[in-house]
């Protein structure tokens, strides 16, 4: 998807909500895996590094220097603990200012949410975003030149209640509502 976006628009900005940075060089011995896509995208010139924001990153597998590569590319990394107990509306004002008027891709990995809200994913991490915070982030993208979006890593088999699928469907609806050209009622 990012290749198609970059082919049409050049390198794009990225709002990436996820528990993980997805910038590993390899994962399970492979250069292509669910933990490597944004490193590959940078290497291919698909992302404008100074226009990338990663929100909700956390996990026991991370050390402080694990975010160095992202930051060296110009990414802004907002760890989950920076989001705890607060509204993310002010953060999204900063994000809109940073990303400016150029094309932006919005990627929401369901594990960016705390597993209390979305347990149906393959790599859950405690301490994630709340559902109201997720809505603030997505709705905070209104006004950006969003050229594409996705919701990834929903795994209904891991959630017998069906809550994750419901949350995912609602997040996708919210993403559609912030696409350029969508009319809002007063």
Please give the residue ranges for each predicted region.
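Conserved alpha-helical scaffold segments that buttress catalytic/binding sites
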Residues: 1-186
């Amino acid at each position: 998807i990012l290749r198609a976006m970059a082919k049409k628009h050049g390198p794009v900005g990225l709002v990436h909500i996820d528990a993980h940075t997805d910038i590993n060089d390899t994962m399970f011995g492979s250069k292509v895996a669910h933990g490597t896509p944004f490193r590959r995208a940078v290497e291919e010139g698909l992302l404008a590094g100074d226009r990338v924001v990663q929100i909700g990153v956390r996990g026991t597998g991370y050390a402080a220097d694990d975010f160095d590569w992202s930051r060296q590319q110009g990414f802004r990394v907002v760890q989950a603990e920076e989001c705890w107990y607060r509204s993310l509306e002010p953060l999204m004002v900063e994000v809109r200012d940073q990303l400016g008027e150029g094309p932006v891709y919005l990627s929401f990995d369901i594990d960016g949410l705390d597993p209390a809200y979305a347990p149906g994913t393959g790599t859950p991490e405690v301490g994630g975003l709340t559902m109201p915070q997720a809505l603030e982030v997505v709705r905070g993208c209104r006004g950006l030149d969003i050229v594409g979006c996705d919701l990834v890593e929903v795994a209904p088999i891991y959630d017998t209640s069906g809550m994750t699928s419901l949350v995912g469907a609602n997040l996708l609806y919210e993403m559609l509502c912030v696409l350029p050209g969508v009319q809002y009622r007063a």
